[in-house]
Amino acid sequence: MSLHAWEWEEDPASIEPISSITSFYQSTSECDVEEHLKAKARAQESDSDRPCSSIESSSEPASTFSSDVPHVVPCKFTISLAFPVNMGQKGKYASLIEKYKKHPKTDSSVTKMRRFYHIEYFLLPDDEEPKKVDILLFPMVAKVFLESGVKTVKPWHEGDKAWVSWEQTFNITVTKELLKKINFHKITLRLWNTKDKMSRKVRYYRLKTAGFTDDVGAFHKSEVRHLVLNQRKLSEQGIENTNIVREESNQEHPPGKQEKTEKHPKSLQGSHQAEPETSSKNSEEYEKSLKMDDSSTIQWSVSRTPTISLAGASMMEIKELIESESLSSLTNILDRQRSQIKGKDSEGRRKIQRRHKKPLAEEEADPTLTGPRKQSAFSIQLAVMPLLAGTHCLPCSQQLLLVLWPERP
């Protein structure tokens, strides 16, 4: 558009030199006319360079508009940890808690009893340095040392566990490449209970009396309790969804059909080893990958969608299913699995009639006969951010994480 506008503006200007040249030619000599033409040619050459610059300037915003422009998105990351109360102190930690409840002013012994915890995790796939958090846990207060500052948290004691929760806000630069990588990214939270991993500032930190007072932005017991109960409710909903999937998969294989499959002779299994081996390789690889995960299900939270069993599907098919915009690939995978199961059942029935059957006593005593297949749940919920899972965690939704610290014997 800028190029056409420039040509339209310069059309009258290109006519003006011609009229001036003719009038000047009548009154001057030929040499003066040649000098005048050379001067005009130089002026036109200098003007011809300007449209290129205008074209370049006009093309720059178009290229930036079509390119992958990053967007800064604030992300709130909330962590809730449950620490055991009676761990390694022979009941001293619990007795100090009861002592502080009765006499809050006597805090000299309470400040000396502290435990050290160091946490590291990679928030984004391309992070080179992990996010680090240091925790000093006292009987009635916890100090959380973040990169942005120090937070005071009042733990919520539930039985023999002390819950500590805090929030961190990260400004993430979101691009198309990051959205592609983050769908397959899993956050692994690593935790150490050693003093060597702590920074020098935290290692020699001494809790003062002011540490028990209410700080600005501190997490109180009621807030920690509300946050933990909310996370627990979300995790129970996720467990119920997986149980529904398992019940539906069991209904697809009723007990009557299972008994019929158990009565198949052992010779049938030997003659058909080549057929199920190829189809079961993908399911075995997928089950191994699920066992390596920390939780039994992988969930993407934000929109609640019905969960679907994908046992027997390869990892490439699952990735294609996640990246696809429609559900056509999902229906194709399910139809393919059903057709394979029906074809194998019909072939098995035909070959059973041709072969001799085993005695019932041998079939009941033989534990290697083919039984019902194990149905593994793979629940998918469309969202931008995946579930943030740790080493010891309960499945939950949103950007929340529940981690249980195991007790030592």
Swiss-Prot record:
Ranges of Polar residues composition bias in the record: 268-281
TM region(s), chain numbering: none
Chain segments annotated as coiled-coil in the UniProt record: none
Compositional bias (Basic and acidic residues): 36-50, 245-265, 282-294, 338-350
Family annotation (InterPro entries): DUF4550 (IPR027876)
Region (Disordered): 36-67, 239-298, 338-373
Biased composition (Low complexity): 51-67
Protein name: Uncharacterized protein CFAP92
Lineage of source species: Eukaryota, Metazoa, Chordata, Craniata, Vertebrata
